[in-house]
Design a protein with these regions (language model features):
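Beta-strand/loop edge motif enriched in small/polar residues
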Residues: 19-285, 290-385
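C-terminal outer-membrane/trafficking sorting elements
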Residues: 393-466
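Terminal non-domain segments
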Residues: 2-7, 153-154, 160-163, 168, ...
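Bacterial Sec-dependent N-terminal signal peptides
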Residues: 1-21, 384, 388
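Acidic/polar, low-complexity intrinsically disordered N-terminal segments immediately downstream
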Residues: 39-41, 387, 395-400
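Short, Lys/Arg-enriched, disordered terminal segments
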Residues: 1-4, 358, 464-466
Length: 466
């Protein structure tokens, strides 16, 4: 059936209103103009291979809502050729429904058929009330989609694209899922974006970089995504992070969340502020929690995992949290001697630490008592001897590390990949070494460092004057 376009001209009080009904196949290069807008989609549209549909800035494409609640009946725009929809800041291109009721998704979305050579250029658009949002049927390694000043609202999924995605000044509002899973390929990069009242903001991307973004009133924000999150705010969400691993969270602000960070391991959380959360941080194995201010939450830090001594909790202020400043939910012993609890009274500090003294199924926690400035240690509270060397050498079944002058010697049983970090998570070395002894000439400031191997094992040592 050939594509049928009907043009309606309605006159009222001397003013003419245009709308164009469209459906079916696009078999030749076609432009939808602002003069013909809005375009009322009465049947699904397919742009065929080798053909281009260009939509001018300021156009509205309005899909007729389906009320059967059967997605098989939903109308869609399928791209087997090329779609060019590049709006402007003043004249965005709008893909919407004839019924924009909140929470009602009633058209299918924009489907990019990469398997047939389909491509899209989309920018400065509004997308709302779609079920699948914008999706592609095959991964697009190397493909880049740039979205600037876009708005994604009331979609079941806003975007399901296995490609490299860049968002700038975009808003994700009241979606089921904002940026959906990238199971095979893809990355997400967002700068100065807002995520509000979504059920889930970002899920299972292969790599994310978020800078200067705000997350408010979402049920879930970031699920299972490694990457870097810097200078972002998470306010009044249920879960800010969950099933998180391999992330660097730097200079962020967490306020009023049920859980700030629910972290599974191998992450760095630094220079951030946590306040008014029910639980600020759930910390897994092989992670760094450094230089954070964690105050006035229900619980400050819950330490979990199977090897809590592999997590480095250093130089934080853990103060005035209602239930506990620190809760050990494992049966392992560890120490937090470089953290300040904002009190010089050991009884007050003990009341804020939940460990084996409170529940014999839990391990014990050693700590230090600081003065009111949190700058000077007054004394140590050692509940259990951990037999952890404070400096070099440090020995386990596969490692031996020692320092000679300004050289670090590493002895390993098997070939491995190593990384060298400082306590803030900054990487100074990433190197493959052979079995046996390796000599590393390093220019490092005096201090505490961590050496990790490819299996996630981390080993703390002191580097400096002998």
């Amino acid at each position: 059936m050939k594509k049928l376009i009907t043009l309606f001209i309605i006159f009222s009080v001397g003013i003419s209103f245009f709308q164009t009904s469209v459906s079916g196949g696009i078999y030749q290069n076609t432009t939808w103009t602002t003069a013909g807008s809005p375009y009322i989609v009465t049947g699904s549209i397919v742009v065929f291979p080798g053909k281009t549909l260009t939509i001018e800035p300021g156009c509205e494409v309005r899909f007729t809502a389906d009320y059967s609640f059967n997605t098989g009946n939903f109308l869609y725009l399928e791209i087997r050729g090329t779609l060019v929809a590049l709006g402007t800041d003043a004249n965005k291109i709008k893909f919407t429904s004839s019924d924009t009721t909140d929470g009602f998704q009633n058209w299918l979305g924009i489907s990019i058929k990469g398997s047939q050579g389909g491509t899209c250029q989309l920018d400065r658009i509004v997308l709302q009330n779609a079920w699948n949002g914008i999706s592609n049927d095959v991964p697009e390694p190397g493909a880049i989609y740039n979205f600037t000043n876009c708005r994604f609202k009331n979609n079941n999924y806003a975007l399901q694209l296995n490609a490299d995605l860049y968002y700038t000044n975009c808003v994700f509002e009241k979606n089921g899922v904002g940026q959906a899973a990238q199971n095979i390929y893809g990355s997400m990069n967002a700068t100065n974006c807002q995520f509000t009242q979504n059920f889930c903001s970002v899920t299972w991307s292969n790599s994310i970089t978020l800078v200067d973004c705000i997350f408010t009133g979402n049920t879930n924000n970031i699920i299972g995504c490694p990457g870097t999150i810097q200078n972002c705010s998470f306010i009044n969400n249920d879960l800010a992070f969950t099933e998180t691993f391999g992330v660097q969270i730097i200079d962020c602000f967490f306020d009023g969340n049920n859980v700030g960070i629910d972290e599974n391991g191998s992450s760095t959380i630094s220079n951030s502020v946590f306040t008014n959360n029910s639980i600020a941080v759930k910390l897994g194995d092989n992670s760094f929690l450094t230089n954070n201010t964690i105050t006035n939450n229900g619980t400050g830090v819950q330490v979990r995992g199977t090897n809590p001594s592999s997590a480095q909790i250093m130089y934080n202020q853990l103060c005035n949290n209602v239930n506990y400043n620190l809760e050990n939910i494992t049966d392992k012993n560890f120490q937090v001697n470089t953290n300040c609890f904002c009190s010089s009274d050991s009884a007050t500090i003990e009341n804020g630490i939940y460990d084996g003294y409170d529940d014999i199924t839990r391990g014990l926690v050693n700590y230090a008592i600081y003065d009111d400035s949190c700058a000077n240690i007054l004394s140590y509270v050692t509940k259990v001897e951990l037999n952890e060397p404070a400096g070099l050498p440090e020995l386990n079944t596969t490692w031996k590390i020692w320092q000679v002058n300004d050289e670090l010697h590493v002895l390993v049983e098997n070939e491995t990949q190593i990384q060298l970090f400082d306590i803030a998570g900054n990487i100074f070395l990433n190197k493959a070494i052979l079995a046996g002894e390796t000599l590393l000439k390093l220019e490092l400031a005096t201090g505490i460092y961590m050496l990790s191997d490819q299996n996630g094992n981390r080993h703390k040592f002191y580097f400096g004057n002998q």
